[in-house]
C-alpha cells in the first residue's frame, strides 16, 4: 500500500502509557484510533522526512532519512510497536468508515514490515540509496513552495547528510541480485549529472550569500560521494552480486493482501491476466484489420509511431486534447469536475527530462503555498539527430497522445487530485493503493473510448484516426497485461518460471512492444514486483461498476458511479466495494 514516497523509518514513538499496552474498550475505540492516527503520522514523517516534503509538510525539509542498519532496526521495532498498539483496538467497535481506515493503516504497517524483514531491499538494492538521496533533493526542487533561498538552505542541510548515507549503503548491501547492481550503475552517471548541472541551475537565482557558500561545499561533496559509490559498485559490489530478486509465491501473495487487499489465488490471478491479454490481442487484430487488412500488427504500430504532432506543436496538441476531453466529460456526464482550474501545461523542467516524457506533478495534500498542478511534457533537445527526435516523438503518436492525456489528466490522475479535498480522512489522503490510483487512470483510457471519445468529432478527425487512437489504447493495455503476467511468473513461478530474457521476449511477442521497451519493463519488474496493479485495478473497477449497475438498475448513472468512487479516496477497491455495495463480495 502506497504512502507518499517512503524511504527508511527511524526513531521511536512515544504514547501515553494507558494507550501503549492495554486493550482499548469499545467505548473509547473511535477516540483512541483518531488519536493514534495523528501520532502515527507525526512519527512517520519524522522518520520519513522526504515523504513529509512531498506531502507539503515543510518542517521536515532540512532532515534526511536514517539509512543505517541501526536505523532500519529502529524502524522495524517502531512498526511492530505500532502494529501492537493498533491491534489493541477492536475494529468492530468502529463505524464503517473508520473501521476501513483502521484496516488500511494496519495493512500499510504490515506491508512495510514485509519489505524490511522479508524482501529486505535495504540489503539488496544499491539504487535505493543513490536514487533515494537524489529524490530527497528533487522533492525540494520540483515545486516553488518557498522562496529560493529558503529551499536552497534546506538542500544544503540534506546534502550534508548524503555522503554518510552512501557509506551506510556499503555496510548494508550484502548480496544484491546482479540486475539490481547493473541498474544502479546505469543510473549513477545521470544522478551525478543531476547534482552537477540541474541542482545548481534550479538555485541559480538564490542570493543568500551564506547559503550559496555552504552549497559550494556540500554539492561538490555529494558529487564526489556519488562518483566514489559508483566506482565501489563497479569494482567491489558487482562481482559479488549473485542474489535473487524473486519474491516467491508466499511473499508475493502477502504483498498483494497488504498493499491492495487482494487475496485471489495466484493461479487464478494469472488466468485472469492471460484472459485479458488474449481479449486485447483479439481486439487489436480486429481494429488493425479495419485500418489495413494487408498489414501485420507490428506494421500497423510502425505506422502509428510516425503519426504525431511536430515537436514545436506538442504542447498545443496536449492543450487541445485537454479542452476536447473536458468538453466530452461534461457533455457526456462522465464525472463531475470539482474545479475548472486546469493543470499548468509546460515543458518538463531540465532536471526532470532524463526520467520522464510526460508526467502530472500535483502538490501534496498539505501543501498550502505551491498549490498548482503541473503537466510536464518533455520536448526533443536541440542538437538531437533526426532519428533520435523521431524516436522520442513516437511516444506522442496520435494514440498515445490521447491515452497519456486521459491517464494523467482528464479524467485520470488530475481529476482524482481535484477530488482530494472530499476524501473522507487523513488516512485516505496519505495512504493509497496502486490498484486504485493507477487502476483508475488505466481504466479511464479504455472507458473514455468506450463512451465515445476518440471518434470523429470527439477527439478524432476521421474514422481512420479513430481506429489509430483505439490501436494506441490497446497497445498500452497490452503493455499492462504483459506486466501483469511477467510479474507473477518472474517472481513466483506460477504458470511456469520466467527468466529475464523470456520476459523481454514476452513483452515483444505478446505485449506488442519494442525490444527496448521490453528490456526496460523487465528491469522494472525485477524490483517493482507488483506492477500488475494497472490491469488488476482496471479489472476490479470494471467489475465494481457492473455490480453497482446491477444493484442500482435503472437508477444507475455512470457519472454518479465515478463521483461516488472518487469520493472514497485512494483506498483499495475492496474498501470502496464495501462502501458502495455494503457487502464483502469478491473484487474479481
Regions found by a protein language model. Give the residues of each.
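Signal peptide processing junction and immediate N-terminal pro/mature segment
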Residues: 16-22
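Bacterial N-terminal signal peptides
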Residues: 5-16
Amino acid at each position: 500500500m502506497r504512502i507518499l514516497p517512503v524511504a527508511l523509518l527511524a526513531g521511536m514513538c512515544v504514547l501515553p502509557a494507558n494507550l501503549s499496552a492495554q486493550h482499548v474498550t469499545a467505548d473509547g475505540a473511535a477516540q483512541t484510533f483518531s488519536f493514534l492516527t495523528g501520532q502515527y503520522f507525526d512519527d512517520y514523517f519524522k522518520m520519513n522526512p522526504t515523504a513529509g516534503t512531498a506531502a507539503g509538510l515543510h518542517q521536515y525539509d532540512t532532515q534526511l532519512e536514517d539509512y543505517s542498519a541501526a536505523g532500519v532496526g529502529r524502524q522495524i521495532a517502531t512498526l511492530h510497536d505500532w502494529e501492537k498498539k493498533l491491534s489493541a483496538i477492536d475494529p468492530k467497535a468502529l463505524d464503517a468508515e473508520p473501521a476501513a481506515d483502521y484496516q488500511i493503516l494496519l495493512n500499510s504497517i504490515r506491508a512495510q514490515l514485509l519489505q524490511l524483514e522479508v524482501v529486505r531491499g535495504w540489503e539488496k538494492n544499491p539504487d535505493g540509496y543513490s536514487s533515494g538521496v537524489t529524490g530527497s533533493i528533487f522533492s525540494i526542487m520540483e515545486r516553488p513552495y518557498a522562496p529560493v533561498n529558503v529551499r536552497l538552505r534546506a538542500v544544503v542541510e540534506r546534502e550534508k547528510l548524503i555522503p554518510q548515507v552512501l557509506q551506510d549503503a556499503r555496510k548494508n548491501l550484502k548480496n544484491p541480485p546482479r540486475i539490481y547492481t547493473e541498474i544502479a550503475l546505469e543510473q549513477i552517471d545521470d544522478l551525478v549529472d543531476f547534482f552537477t548541472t540541474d541542482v545548481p541551475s534550479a538555485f541559480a537565482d538564490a542570493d543568500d550569500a551564506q547559503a550559496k557558500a555552504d552549497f559550494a561545499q556540500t554539492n561538490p561533496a555529494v558529487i564526489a560521494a556519488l562518483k566514489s559509490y559508483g566506482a565501489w559498485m563497479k569494482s567491489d559490489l558487482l562481482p559479488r552480486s549473485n542474489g535473487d530478486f524473486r519474491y516467491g509465491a508466499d511473499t508475493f501473495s502477502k504483498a498483494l493482501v497488504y498493499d491492495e487487499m487482494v487475496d485471489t489465488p495466484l493461479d487464478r490471478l494469472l488466468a485472469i491476466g492471460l484472459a485479458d491479454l488474449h481479449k486485447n490481442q483479439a481486439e487489436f487484430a480486429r481494429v488493425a484489420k479495419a485500418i489495413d487488412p494487408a498489414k501485420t500488427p507490428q506494421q500497423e504500430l510502425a505506422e502509428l509511431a510516425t503519426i504525431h504532432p511536430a515537436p514545436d506543436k506538442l504542447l498545443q496538441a496536449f492543450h487541445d486534447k485537454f479542452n476536447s476531453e473536458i468538453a466530452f466529460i461534461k457533455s457526456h456526464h462522465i464525472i463531475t469536475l470539482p474545479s475548472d482550474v486546469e493543470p499548468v501545461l509546460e515543458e518538463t523542467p531540465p532536471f526532470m527530462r532524463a526520467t520522464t516524457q510526460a508526467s502530472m506533478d500535483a502538490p501534496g495534500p498539505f501543501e498550502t503555498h505551491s498549490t498548482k498542478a503541473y503537466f510536464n511534457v518533455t520536448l526533443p533537445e536541440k542538437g538531437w539527430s533526426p532519428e533520435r527526435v523521431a524516436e522520442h516523438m513516437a511516444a506522442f503518436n496520435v494514440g498515445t497522445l490521447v491515452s497519456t492525456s486521459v491517464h494523467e489528466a482528464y479524467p485520470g490522475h488530475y481529476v482524482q487530485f481535484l477530488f482530494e479535498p472530499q476524501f473522507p480522512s487523513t488516512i485516505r489522503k496519505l495512504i493509497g493503493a496502486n490498484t486504485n490510483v493507477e487502476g483508475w487512470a488505466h481504466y479511464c483510457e479504455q472507458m473514455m473510448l468506450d463512451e465515445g471519445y476518440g471518434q470523429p468529432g470527439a477527439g478524432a478527425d476521421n474514422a481512420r484516426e479513430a481506429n489509430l487512437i483505439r490501436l494506441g489504447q490497446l497497445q498500452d493495455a497490452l503493455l499492462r497485461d504483459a506486466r501483469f503476467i511477467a510479474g507473477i511468473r518472474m517472481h513466483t513461478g506460477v504458470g511456469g518460471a520466467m527468466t529475464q530474457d523470456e520476459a523481454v521476449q514476452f513483452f515483444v511477442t505478446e505485449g506488442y512492444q519494442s525490444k527496448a521497451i521490453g528490456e526496460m519493463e523487465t528491469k522494472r519488474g525485477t524490483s517493482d514486483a507488483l506492477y500488475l496493479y494497472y490491469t488488476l485495478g482496471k479489472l476490479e473497477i470494471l467489475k465494481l461498476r457492473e455490480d453497482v449497475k446491477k444493484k442500482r438498475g435503472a437508477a444507475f448513472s455512470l457519472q454518479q458511479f465515478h463521483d461516488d468512487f472518487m469520493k472514497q479516496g485512494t483506498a483499495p477497491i475492496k474498501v470502496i466495494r464495501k462502501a458502495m455495495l455494503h457487502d464483502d463480495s469478491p473484487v474479481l
